[in-house]
């Protein structure tokens, strides 16, 4: 995993699968969405195989691994089931995330500092099979430093607090928290990605932060695609972040 010279867009297709699973049909196909996203300029495709299988299924992951022209960023919880699955399919990129059954979406970052031995073991186990691991964490120096200690080459900073901020003061504070996290991560020698809750009206400020390698965005893209189509939604987002990062 190397730092890109330009900002990258990772497209999360989980919620295409959410729509499919709502009726238990074969459509819409997240694999087709992934291929359309690639054609529209996505630099990678992100999928989260959750313990409860609420959206992405094993079959989706296997198909994507075979057909993607870019790369798959496989999000997973730190469980024996997921580690064994990863060892079987060997995705090039894995992002370890926290996970609870009751949450609507990932609610916070992984507590690396509070479980260093467990996370280090997972990172080492995945590295042995050639997987490059990132850790989804809050923009907190303690968690960033712990991520470095456990051997992860990359982190993804949770931008949910920024996305949820209501007042201009709160927005500015949370944006600065992300910017400080990026700077600290880079100083630790880590590749720094970011994502969660980003959409067409708040993404530019984050994309403008110097040093961010990649933004992972999903729900907003799928929602916008209902009105403009998936390729157009991805192309619009890609144009926004590239322009903001200049």
UniProtKB/Swiss-Prot annotation:
- The entry's active site is 48, 75, 196
Annotated catalysed reactions = 3-amino-2-oxopropyl phosphate + 1-deoxy-D-xylulose 5-phosphate = pyridoxine 5'-phosphate + phosphate + 2 H2O + H(+)
On assembly, the entry states:
Homooctamer; tetramer of dimers.
Q: Where does 1-deoxy-D-xylulose 5-phosphate bind?
A: 14-15, 50, 55, 105
HAMAP family reported in the protein's UniProt record? PdxJ
UniProt pathway annotation: Cofactor biosynthesis; pyridoxine 5'-phosphate biosynthesis; pyridoxine 5'-phosphate from D-erythrose 4-phosphate: step 5/5
Name of this chain's protein: Pyridoxine 5'-phosphate synthase
The entry's cellular-component GO terms read: cytosol
Function field: Catalyzes the complicated ring closure reaction between the two acyclic compounds 1-deoxy-D-xylulose-5-phosphate (DXP) and 3-amino-2-oxopropyl phosphate (1-amino-acetone-3-phosphate or AAP) to form pyridoxine 5'-phosphate (PNP) and inorganic phosphate.
**Compartments in which it is found:** Cytoplasm
Site keyed Transition state stabilizer: positions: 156
What are the UniProt keywords, alphabetically? Cytoplasm, Pyridoxine biosynthesis, Transferase
Please name the SUPFAM superfamilies in this protein's record.
Pyridoxine 5'-phosphate synthase
Return the EC number.
Answer: 2.6.99.2
> Major place of localization?
cytoplasm
UniProt lists the family membership as follows: Belongs to the PNP synthase family.
What GO terms are given for molecular function? pyridoxine 5'-phosphate synthase activity
In this record, what's one Pfam family?
PdxJ
Q: Which Gene3D superfamilies match?
A: Aldolase class I
Q: Any idea which positions bind 3-amino-2-oxopropyl phosphate? A: 12, 23, 197, 218-219
The Gene Ontology biological process annotation of the record reads: pyridoxine biosynthetic process
């Amino acid at each position: 995993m190397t730092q890109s010279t330009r900002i990258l867009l990772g497209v999360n297709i989980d919620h295409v699968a959410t729509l499919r699973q709502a009726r238990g049909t074969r459509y819409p196909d997240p694999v087709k969405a992934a291929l359309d996203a690639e054609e529209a300029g996505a630099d990678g495709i992100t999928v989260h195989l959750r313990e409860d299988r609420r959206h992405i299924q094993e079959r989706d992951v296997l198909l994507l691994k075979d057909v993607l022209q870019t790369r798959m960023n496989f999000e997973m919880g730190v469980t024996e089931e997921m580690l064994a699955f990863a060892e079987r399919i060997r995705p090039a990129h894995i992002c370890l995330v926290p996970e609870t059954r009751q949450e609507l979406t990932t609610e916070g970052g992984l507590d690396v500092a509070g479980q260093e031995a467990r996370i280090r073991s997972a990172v080492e186990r995945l590295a042995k099979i050639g997987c490059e691991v990132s850790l989804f964490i809050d923009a907190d120096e303690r968690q960033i430093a712990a991520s470095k200690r456990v051997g992860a080459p990359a982190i993804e900073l949770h931008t949910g607090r920024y996305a949820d901020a209501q007042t201009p003061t709160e927005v500015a504070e949370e944006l600065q928290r992300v910017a400080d996290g990026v700077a600290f991560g880079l100083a630790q020698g880590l590749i720094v990605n970011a994502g969660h809750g980003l959409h067409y009206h708040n993404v530019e400020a984050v994309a403008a932060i110097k040093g961010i390698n990649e933004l992972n965005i999903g729900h907003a893209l799928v929602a916008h695609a209902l009105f403009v189509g998936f390729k157009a939604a991805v192309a619009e987002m890609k144009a926004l972040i590239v322009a903001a990062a200049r």
